[in-house]
A protein has these predicted regions:
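ATP/nucleoside-binding phosphotransfer catalytic cores, i.e., glycine-rich phosphate-binding loops
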Residues: 2-23, 36, 41-47, 52-54, ...
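A glycine- and small-aliphatic-rich helix-loop capping segment at beta-alpha/alpha-beta transitions
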Residues: 95-106, 128-129, 197-206
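A glycine-rich beta-strand to alpha-helix segment
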Residues: 173-202
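Gly/Ser/Thr-rich loops at beta-strand to alpha-helix junctions
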Residues: 82-92, 186-191, 266-267
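Glycine-rich N-terminal segment of FAD-binding domains in flavoprotein oxidoreductases
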Residues: 71-103
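Class I SAM-dependent methyltransferase SAM-binding "motif I" and its flanking Rossmann-like core
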Residues: 193-241
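Ligand-binding beta-strand-loop-alpha-helix segment within the catalytic cores
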Residues: 29-50, 57, 104-183, 238-239, ...
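Conserved acidic residues
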Residues: 80, 177-183, 256, 299
Length: 316
């Protein structure tokens, strides 16, 4: 007895994205060890899975990878465009630490925050509001860098006015030799930024889906709301906005490199990200699972080792 055998007539019927084959997804839940981590035919030869033993290891290693991208671009004399998330967050402290230790400034870096909470029209909170992603980035990354920080004119946030300019700005940078790196986490419904799986049903083809660069006032999936209630709002569901501004695959699939993170452990054996990680790694790329496309790009996905263990039920 499980969801598959009891779905009919339940409150969950019609809840999941229409393009999800729950039977296939259920089989992915069985994967563990080498069966999970072995490269799939569609993986980019430059894609690498990096297990991290502890959360401290995860934050340090991902922070080092971000700092190393910035340092290498500086040494190469290249501009660096970085699409940045708010979450995971612990890596920014270490990125700052490494850059300061190396004496590397960020004058060549262009930061593009990938998303922001909004209403249905794409209006966002003021940038200095404690709940705004802009505020979070200023506190975690741009501020602590001090005099070596990213220039104000090169910090871009996903507001109604600024997000539609991302594609042209990034395109102009790349045309002059800049490198584009996307830093990301994986959502409960396998979104990248707030690009939700159900959006796939709105496009006539995968090609048109892959070309869309952004969305203002994107309607979020209920599982996204609840994920953020648990991970960012301390269970206070009514404080989570139902819409967000977000980049789309037309931007993140243009990345020259990626740095991803999966750290969704909650403690006492509880977690929220194990199945989402398996869908990302082992499901053939499809617009209905946005994160499944990230393995087709070169770069690294840092993962808490516990998420690679078996997903055996355990009552808590």
């Amino acid at each position: 007895m499980d969801l598959l055998t009891t779905l009919s007539g339940s409150a969950m019927e019609g809840f999941f994205p229409a393009g999800w084959n729950l039977g296939v997804i259920d089989k992915l839940g069985d994967l563990r060890g080498e069966g999970l981590t072995k490269p799939r035919p569609w993986w980019n030869p430059g894609f690498q899975l990096v297990p991290c033993g502890t959360l401290a290891d995860f934050d340090t290693m991902l922070g080092h990878a971000i700092a190393l991208e910035i340092r290498q671009a500086k040494e190469q004399g290249r501009q660096l465009a970085m699409i940045l998330p708010v979450g995971p967050m612990g890596m920014y402290r270490w990125a700052v630490w490494f850059l300061k230790q190396w004496g590397v400034d960020c004058l060549h870096v262009h930061g593009f925050n990938m998303d922001e909470w909004s209403d249905a029209q794409g209006n966002t909170l003021p940038g200095d509001h404690p709940g705004a992603f802009q505020h979070a980035m200023e506190q975690a990354f741009y501020g602590p860098l001090g005099a070596a920080t990213v220039p104000l004119s090169q910090r871009h946030f996903a507001t109604r006015e600024k997000l539609p300019t991302y594609a042209d700005r990034i395109g102009a940078l790349k045309s002059k030799g800049a490198r584009l790196v996307t830093v990301f986490g994986i959502g409960r419904v396998c979104h990248i930024a707030f690009w939700e799986p159900q959006f796939a049903g709105e496009y006539p083809s995968a090609r048109e889906w892959a070309a869309d660069t952004h969305r203002l006032g994107a309607k979020l999936h209920p599982l996204t709301i609840e994920q953020n209630a648990l991970t960012s709002f301390k269970s206070w569901t009514t404080r989570v906005p139902a819409f967000a501004n977000t980049i789309g695959p037309g931007l993140f699939l243009q990345s020259d490199g990626i740095l991803g993170g999966a750290d969704g452990m909650l403690g006492r054996g509880m977690q929220w990200q194990g199945l989402s990680l398996r869908m990302t790694l082992a499901h053939e790329p499809t617009p209905w699972i946005p994160s499944s496309h990230m393995t087709t790009l070169p770069g690294k996905l840092f993962v808490l080792s516990e998420l690679l263990d078996g997903l055996d039920p355990e009552c808590n």
